[in-house]
């Protein structure tokens, strides 16, 4: 449903909602997921971590473009704010549901014991020792925090999504 929501805006030629969905919500989620993967890869796969560092920088540029463009568009079309806020809330819910499903699936797999020297700290959570629930929570909280910050910069009020069951 996440992709369907975004594609619906694109198919309806709703440029403003499409840019918010793509450059704030989707790209904002992507760079946070990549940051988490990069943190977890630094010690054991530094080449992959370095690749992710470049990917994260690229995603941040996309988000920055979206912020710059959306701010001016929202000022020109304030009537779009309520619709975009609803879309952000809907897309955020689907994103959280995807995270929940992914980490529940991961919870069924046996986890290898992490070496004692591993300290992959991601926003206060050691990914080497965190449970799937803890990883899901830190990822969701980080992404939603980024959304709040970025949406406020462009004049859109963040809407708290329902939490998936």
Mark where each language-model region is.
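Non-heme di-metal
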Residues: 1-165
């Amino acid at each position: 449903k996440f992709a369907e929501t975004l594609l619906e805006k694109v198919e309806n030629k709703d440029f403003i909602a499409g840019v918010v969905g793509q450059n704030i919500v989707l790209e904002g989620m992507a760079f946070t997921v990549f940051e988490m993967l990069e943190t977890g890869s630094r010690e054991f796969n530094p080449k992959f971590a370095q690749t992710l560092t470049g990917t994260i920088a690229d995603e941040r540029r996309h988000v920055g473009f979206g912020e710059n463009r959306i701010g001016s568009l929202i000022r020109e079309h304030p009537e779009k704010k309520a619709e975009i806020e609803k879309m952000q809330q809907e897309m955020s819910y689907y994103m959280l549901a995807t995270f929940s499903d992914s980490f529940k699936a991961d919870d069924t797999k046996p986890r290898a014991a992490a070496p004692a020297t591993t300290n992959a700290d991601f926003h206060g959570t050691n990914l080497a020792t965190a449970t799937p629930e803890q990883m899901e929570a830190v990822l969701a909280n980080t992404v939603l925090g980024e959304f709040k910050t970025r949406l406020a910069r462009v004049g859109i009020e963040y809407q708290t999504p329902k939490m998936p069951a």
